């Protein structure tokens, strides 16, 4: 059994073994995020799905109203004049077959890969490299598109892709410890709505199994999913 550090053990004693109201949970997470850097705030959500079945898989995108607080490096594989469009739109890496070859050789200095449909036959050959890292472009995720300028703009602004892993768990970063608890909650509410909206057609029984939030170096806190779902913004 992995031994907790003194810091983590101390922080964990401040958390009761119960389900917390959303804003209370976020306040605790912010208080415990006292590392010497701006910790990332993450959600870990267990869903009642079995992703080995195609009709129980979840993979989509969400545009968080306050972004994630993180800058991402975007690579674009495209052709012709779209290469210069990708550059103008702010892509960090861009190219045609040259970029495909570079990635195949191990150049993975990017967080997101966008490709135009005409390049997908070439990108498909990178499955061995991209697949395990979850970087293979996908139309559902908005990363296979002819509108690369808008795609780059949206992802740079905080739109992110997420999916359920093999165990049916969604891991999503949704802000920084420096965010207000209200901004974090608005991001979390948007994430919840996206997960509900994109509920797999084959999902059976209880959809939301558990919902935890945590920071990079802090303990996790369980959140009342019903309170998140029931919240209605004033006005």
From Swiss-Prot:
Gene3D superfamilies: 3.30.190.20, 3.40.50.790. The keyword Membrane does not apply. InterPro entries: Ribosom_uL1_bac-type (IPR005878), Ribosomal_uL1 (IPR002143), Ribosomal_uL1-like (IPR023674), Ribosomal_uL1/biogenesis (IPR028364), Ribosomal_uL1_3-a/b-sand (IPR016095), Ribosomal_uL1_CS (IPR023673). Keywords: Repressor, Ribonucleoprotein, Ribosomal protein, RNA-binding, rRNA-binding, Translation regulation, tRNA-binding. GO terms for biological process: regulation of translation; translation. HAMAP family: Ribosomal_uL1_B (MF_01318_B). Part of the 50S ribosomal subunit. NCBIfam families: rplA_bact. Belongs to the universal ribosomal protein uL1 family. This is Large ribosomal subunit protein uL1. It comes from Prochlorococcus marinus (strain MIT 9215). The gene is rplA.
């Amino acid at each position: 059994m992995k031994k907790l550090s003194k810091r983590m053990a101390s922080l964990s004693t401040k958390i009761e073994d119960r389900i917390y109201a959303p804003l209370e949970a976020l306040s605790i997470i912010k208080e415990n995020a006292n590392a010497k850097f701006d910790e990332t705030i993450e959600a870990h959500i267990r869903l009642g799905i079995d992703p080995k079945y195609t009709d129980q898989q979840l993979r989509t995108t969400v545009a968080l109203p306050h972004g994630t607080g993180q800058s991402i490096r975007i690579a674009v594989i495209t052709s012709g004049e779209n290469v210069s469009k990708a550059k103008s739109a702010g892509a960090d890496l861009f190219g045609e077959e040259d970029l495909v070859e570079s990635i195949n050789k191990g150049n993975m200095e990017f967080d997101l890969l966008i490709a135009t449909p005409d390049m997908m036959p070439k990108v498909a050959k990178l499955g061995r490299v991209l697949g395990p890292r979850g970087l293979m472009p996908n139309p559902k995720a908005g990363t296979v598109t002819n509108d690369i300028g808008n795609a780059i703009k949206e992802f740079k602004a905080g739109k992110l892709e997420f999916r359920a892993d093999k165990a049916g768990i969604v891991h999503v970063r949704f802000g920084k410890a420096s965010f207000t608890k209200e901004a974090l909650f608005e991001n979390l509410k948007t994430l919840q709505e996206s997960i509900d909206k994109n509920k797999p057609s084959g999902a059976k029984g209880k959809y939301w199994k558990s919902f935890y939030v945590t920071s990079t170096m802090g303990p996790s806190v369980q959140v009342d999913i019903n309170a998140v779902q029931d919240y209605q913004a004033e006005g």
